[in-house]
Structure formats: structure tokens, C-alpha cells
Amino acid sequence: MSKVSRDTLYEAVKEVQAGSRRKKRKFLETVELQISLKNYDPQKDKRFSGTVRLKTTPRPKFSVCVLGDQQHCDEAKAAELPHMDIEALKKLNKNKKLVKKLAKKYDAFLASESLIKQIPRILGPGLNKAGKFPSLLTHNENLGTKVDEVKSTIKFQMKKVLCLAVAVGHVKMSEEELVYNIHLAVNFLVSLLKKNWQNVRALYIKSTMGKPQRLY
């Protein structure tokens, strides 16, 4: 069970939301979970990574582009989703700058089965380097559902430093939605750690421009 009590969570969420109401921003502030680790050696210990799906999409403006076969491109077009077919990808001609630009333009990619294996050959390693290699899109999945799933999935990835941060929501979400998302994210993260809570030095949540609120 989580070492963060529900009361602590609710208090922190209230503070973050109140802070954002006091100082209105011209953009929707993201709420981030910041994690500081201890007893971990990024050089020796296995660097973990894992993804967890949250209940409510943390970033409504998160953009997903479909790299699709004919059917998926038609479905994407009907759903007004950005999409590219194999010909459009070939036109990028493995140009590093253009692939980098594509990786920057969207937050995530979905690719049809027939395309996904060809992506390294057509585009080179650009999407992978940007940490945006496409998720697989099959024909027995509903495109809209799959896009929602990608939008509400967050990734924990341990790099060379002992701190990491992930988006768990935004300030316009309800208290319950934020608390639920944070609870899911914290429990999942702790399950990835070798010694669970013994590896956690501190946990904070903060909005983009707000003050950090300590959870643990």
C-alpha cells in the first residue's frame, strides 16, 4: 500500500489548484509528479522503464499522428487525426532534419502492422532517438480508443540522474481525478523500484508554474 495518505494527497492537490487559481496563466498548466530517488546507482543498477495508463488523460493537447496503411489513414481522416501513409514517409528520404522535425511535431505515433517493421528502414533511427517509436495499431482495435489509450499512458524512464518527473494531470481536472491519477502513478513507480519505498527519497507534485507540494 502507498505510504502517501489520502489526506496528504488531497491537501497537496488542493494547494496546487489554489495556487494556479491565484495566478491565472494563459495556458493550461500541467501537474507533474516529481520523484527523487536514493540508494540507487544509475551506473550499476538496472535502469528501469515502464508505462502505466492513467484514468484521466493528463495532457488534453497531446497530439498523436497515425502512420497508417490505406484503411488506417481513411479512419484517421474521418476522425480528423493527423496521419501519413508510406509514400509520405518515403518522401522524407531518411533526411535527419526532416525526421527530427516530424518527431518534434507530435507527442506520439501509432503505426499500422504493415508499416511498423519498415519504419527503421524508411525513416532511420530518428523517432526511436526521440523516444517516440510508434505503438502498434492493429485492425481489430478501435482507432479512437487506441488514441485515448496513448494519450493517457505515461512513461517512467530512469536515466543517468536520480530524479524523474512525469505529467499526471492538469490544473482544470477535478480533485478526485488528480488524486486518482497520482495514486496510480506513485504505486506503479514504486513497484518498478528494486527496493520499493526504500528507494524513494521524496515525492512532490507541482503545476508548471506553481510551487512544489511534498507528498513524501
UniProtKB/Swiss-Prot annotation:
Disulfide bonds: none
Alphabetized InterPro entries for the sequence: eL8/uL1-like, Ribosomal_uL1, Ribosomal_uL1-like, Ribosomal_uL1/biogenesis, Ribosomal_uL1_3-a/b-sand, Ribosomal_uL1_CS
An annotated GO BP: translation
Matches recorded under SUPFAM superfamilies: Ribosomal protein L1 (SSF56808)
Protein keywords: Cytoplasm, Ribonucleoprotein, Ribosomal protein
One Gene Ontology cellular component: cytosolic large ribosomal subunit
Annotated localization: Cytoplasm
Keyword Cytoplasm: yes
Domain of life according to the entry: Eukaryota
Family: Belongs to the universal ribosomal protein uL1 family.
Function summary: Component of the large ribosomal subunit. The ribosome is a large ribonucleoprotein complex responsible for the synthesis of proteins in the cell.
Subunit composition and interactions: Component of the large ribosomal subunit.
This protein's name: Large ribosomal subunit protein uL1
Organism the protein comes from: Danio rerio
